[in-house]
């Protein structure tokens, strides 16, 4: 800022005269100008920062502009860039880059008391030792110019991978059933031994049609307690990421097709490029691939 001010006035008043009225010494000004003319004369940190800034900005933009300093740093490490986390945080602040902040209410559609007979087989233990051991499901709403639309997800707990999803104009049973069918198609019903499907007690998930489809695929149903979001915490966590990283970043959504396209793009990024701390800061697809490679080698 000071250097730019001197630059603007020095032909008229001279450097020494201007610096006499500003908190900058003439020697400091001339040193800065020499470094501008010859970048090799800059301090090592300044030179390093100049190289890192575009790299950090590239990673942030490639990762859907949602990563904070921690995830940007982790991605840089995966890319072979050696840099301290505090440096990434400092340069992101200089560049005006920041991660998105989660927040927002959830949709709740509780079912009649008759569904209390369906057990909670998970008991808040959202962990799995292999793919297709535990799936969790949930859905949320999105306000658009054409009215509310709804997005449902089926997530494989092992790698946090989204294996099924659906965007619809209504939240009837068909809507969540379509997400389940997509998951079954992708995973294949022949490779689902002892699979548990967990959800909240929403009317869609405990309906006769949904329960029948689970039974036909040999999947054991599990539901959390009424009104307790912690009983489906992992699914709600993914919903929270979706609302933060996709929906909340736009002021206005036009309609179903608009949301559907954005969701398609996000799910692909989520599964194949987004880093997850609980699985070692790798994408879900990579984590699953490692499992199958190790299983084959054994």
Where are these regions (language model features)?
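Charged DNA-binding/catalytic regions of mobile-element recombinases
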Residues: 1-298
């Amino acid at each position: 800022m000071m250097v730019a001010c001197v630059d603007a006035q020095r032909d008229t008043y001279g450097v020494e005269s201007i610096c006499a009225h500003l908190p900058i010494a003439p020697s400091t000004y001339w040193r800065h100008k020499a470094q501008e003319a010859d970048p090799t004369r800059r301090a090592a940190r300044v030179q390093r920062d100049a190289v890192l800034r575009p790299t950090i900005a590239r990673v942030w933009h490639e990762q859907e502009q949602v990563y904070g300093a921690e995830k940007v740093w982790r991605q840089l490490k995966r890319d072979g860039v050696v840099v301290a986390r505090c440096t990434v945080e400092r340069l992101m602040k200089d560049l005006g880059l920041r991660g998105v902040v989660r927040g927002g209410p959830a949709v709740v559609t509780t079912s009649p008391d008759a569904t209390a007979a369906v057990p909670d087989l998970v008991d808040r233990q959202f962990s799995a030792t292999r793919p297709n051991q535990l799936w969790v499901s949930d859905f949320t709403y999105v306000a658009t110019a054409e009215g509310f639309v709804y997005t449902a997800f089926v997530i494989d707990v092992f790698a946090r991978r989204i294996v099924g999803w659906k965007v619809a104009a209504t939240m009837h049973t068909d809507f969540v059933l379509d997400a389940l069918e997509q998951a079954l198609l992708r995973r294949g019903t022949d490779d689902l031994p002892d699979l548990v499907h967990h959800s909240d007690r929403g009317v869609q998930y405990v309906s006769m049609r949904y329960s029948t489809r689970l039974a036909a695929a040999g999947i054991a149903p599990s539901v959390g307690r009424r009104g307790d979001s912690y009983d489906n915490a992992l699914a709600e966590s993914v919903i929270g990421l979706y609302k933060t990283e996709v929906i909340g970043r736009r002021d206005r959504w036009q309609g179903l097709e608009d949301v559907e396209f954005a969701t398609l793009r996000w799910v692909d990024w989520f599964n194949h490029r987004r880093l997850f701390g609980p699985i070692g800061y790798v994408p879900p697809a990579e984590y699953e691939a490692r499992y199958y490679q190790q299983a084959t080698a054994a």
